[in-house]
């Protein structure tokens, strides 16, 4: 079917069967000639076509066994009554050339209805486009508002101008994350005591190191290898208390409120993290720091640690408990507590402490707190990465003592 010459309201679709071989021009000629004058001049096909009331007649033809079958299309700009008359008119054709023929109208299409249907379908698509891309839902608006408010609350902290929440100074504890986007996400969800290190390419910022000496520190890392690298750099120079981790493959900046709360709720102590690394077969100390603790010179052997009881039996008793015992200068037991509570105890106790025996890992933070309390002896299951140990402090491992007995 070719192009139409008018903007039609209706389309008459008819089928003609001819008992002989004819072409398109024969069929169109028969339509004009055999209907001429039947309904008067006003309904003559030629006159209607000249006035633009009907369009160009199109014929799709096929021939088989010396018979011709064709589909006829007549576009009409008449009203529905006049269009119906034209349709009935062409059914009156009985011959094409010398051959008998029959015409049957198959349908009269309302082209305006087809246009209306397409318009409605397109309108539906556009409404969906508006709903999905132009008009955000209430939840999205609230999330945008939260993020805008969070960004407005972000401050620049310290000489390095690190991105931080507004409560870093006021809070006794802080959450250390990697980047500004992490800070924005945590502040958005109500965690205002957060600060970012902004990468470790230039080392850990001094501001973070200084804060870690005064506050309880939770490092919140991404759930990938990059997060572990950041953590190891922090452990070298800062006093880390707890470690929280995003789910595997996720970054802190991507987490929902529930995911953040769960990760922080499941945080572990540095000692527990180091123990997990060992259990996983990782050589944690060699990966984390080139400054491994040296148990010579500054760490005397067990012969230099004197106690009024059998230290080997004490170690056997302590193994597997994850607890610590606190002693005064007379080796009188002052307190027994979980290793994870040891840093807080050392920071807040007014007791005169001489020795600590612990089934855990000595970290730099524990050494620093013990130094402030005047501790002279630490007997421990393991020694973590240390950067400084007082000359008058003895740090001895369980293995050193048991190997000497």
Swiss-Prot record:
Gene3D superfamilies: 3.40.1360.10. Its cofactor is Mg(2+). The keyword Nucleotide-binding does not apply. Its EC number is 2.7.7.101. Mg(2+) 1 binds at residues 178, 222. SMART domains: TOPRIM. GO terms for biological process: DNA replication, synthesis of primer. InterPro entries: DnaG_primase, Primase_DnaG_arc, TOPRIM_DnaG/twinkle, TOPRIM_dom. It catalyses: ssDNA + n NTP = ssDNA/pppN(pN)n-1 hybrid + (n-1) diphosphate. Binds two Mg(2+) per subunit. Forms a ternary complex with MCM helicase and DNA. Component of the archaeal exosome complex. This is DNA primase DnaG. It comes from Pyrobaculum islandicum (strain DSM 4184 / JCM 9189 / GEO3).
């Amino acid at each position: 079917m070719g192009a139409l010459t008018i903007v039609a309201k209706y389309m008459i679709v008819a089928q003609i069967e001819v008992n002989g071989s004819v072409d398109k021009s024969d069929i169109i000629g028969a339509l004009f000639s055999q209907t001429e004058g039947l309904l008067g001049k006003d309904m003559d096909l030629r006159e209607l076509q000249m006035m633009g009331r009907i369009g160009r007649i199109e014929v799709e033809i096929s021939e088989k066994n010396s018979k011709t079958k064709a589909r006829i299309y007549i576009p009409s700009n008449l009203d529905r009554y006049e269009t119906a008359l034209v349709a009935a008119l062409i059914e009156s054709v009985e011959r094409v050339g010398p051959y008998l023929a029959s015409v049957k109208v198959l349908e009269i299409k309302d082209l305006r209805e087809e246009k209306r249907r397409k318009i409605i379908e397109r309108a539906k698509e556009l409404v969906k486009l508006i709903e999905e891309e132009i008009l955000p839902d209430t939840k999205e608006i609230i999330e945008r508002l939260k993020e805008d408010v969070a960004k407005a609350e972000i401050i620049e902290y310290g000489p390095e101008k690190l991105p931080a929440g507004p409560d870093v100074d006021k809070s006794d504890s802080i959450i250390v994350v990697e980047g500004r986007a992490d800070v924005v996400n945590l502040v958005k969800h109500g965690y205002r005591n957060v600060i970012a290190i902004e990468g470790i390419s230039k080392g850990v910022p001094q501001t973070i190191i200084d804060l870690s000496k005064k506050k309880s520190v939770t490092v919140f890392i991404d759930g990938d290898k990059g997060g572990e690298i950041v953590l190891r750099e922090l452990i070298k120079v800062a006093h880390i208390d707890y470690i929280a981790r995003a789910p595997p493959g996720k970054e802190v900046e991507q987490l929902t409120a529930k995911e953040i709360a769960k990760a922080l709720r499941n945080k572990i102590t540095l000692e527990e993290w180091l123990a997990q690394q060992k259990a996983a077969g990782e050589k944690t100390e060699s990966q984390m720091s080139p400054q491994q603790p040296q148990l010579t010179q500054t760490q005397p052997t067990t012969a230099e640690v004197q106690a009024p009881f059998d230290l080997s039996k004490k170690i056997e008793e302590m193994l597997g408990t994850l607890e610590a015992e606190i002693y005064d200068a007379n080796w009188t037991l002052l307190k027994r507590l979980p290793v994870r509570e040891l840093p807080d105890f050392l920071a807040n106790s007014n007791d005169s402490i001489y020795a600590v025996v612990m089934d855990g890992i000595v970290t730099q933070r524990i050494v620093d707190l013990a130094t402030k309390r005047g501790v002279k002896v630490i007997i421990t299951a393991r020694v973590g990465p240390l950067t400084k140990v007082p000359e008058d402090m003895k740090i001895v491992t369980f293995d050193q003592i048991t190997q000497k007995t």
